[in-house]
Amino acid sequence: MDPQAFVDAVREDNKTPLSRLGASKALYADTEGEMDDETVLAAAGDRAHHAAETLSAWADDESDEAAADLFADLAETERDHAETVASEHGDYEPGDPPAVQAHLRTVEGTVERLGALVGWALAAGNNADQVVGYFVGQASPMTASTFREVSGDYDDHVEETSEALATVCESDDDWERAREAAGATITADYEDYFETLEALGVNPKPVC
């Protein structure tokens, strides 16, 4: 398997969760129904802040030098994202870790962590796109433009991480472990979305 085939497989495996995590209800779940500028920014900040903490911890205990460098680089990008939120929302203070970060902190192994990161970045990019859409709707083009750049960073994360996988996956079994880790990460994000909306009395499934 090559990097693009891996990403395509993860997308196909998780088509429904990724689609729903890229819909407006996902942002509603992230903010627990509080759809105002400060709450949307705070939710985005929490995702970035806690992702940076997870990635920094991985960089510190990773034995593969190239993977450790990648984790450190991605952590720095996520810190930049959190600082972007702070510049837009002057009173921002980090809240509790999102469920997907709690899941990622249980993942062990270089192959598994890289696979999990692909899943995380695919879902995170969808989330950033929803933040863009929110601020477009709020007639805040500068903030929307800022989050378009954030979304683009997640596209880069997917590419860089899948390419890193190609250097550590030595067998089909390795690729399969990475694929399962990606799916489990998307599932963790999706289950939190589903449970949060149900608790808010909202149907998590699209109404046809």
Which residues fall in each region the model found?
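Non-heme di-metal
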Residues: 2-208
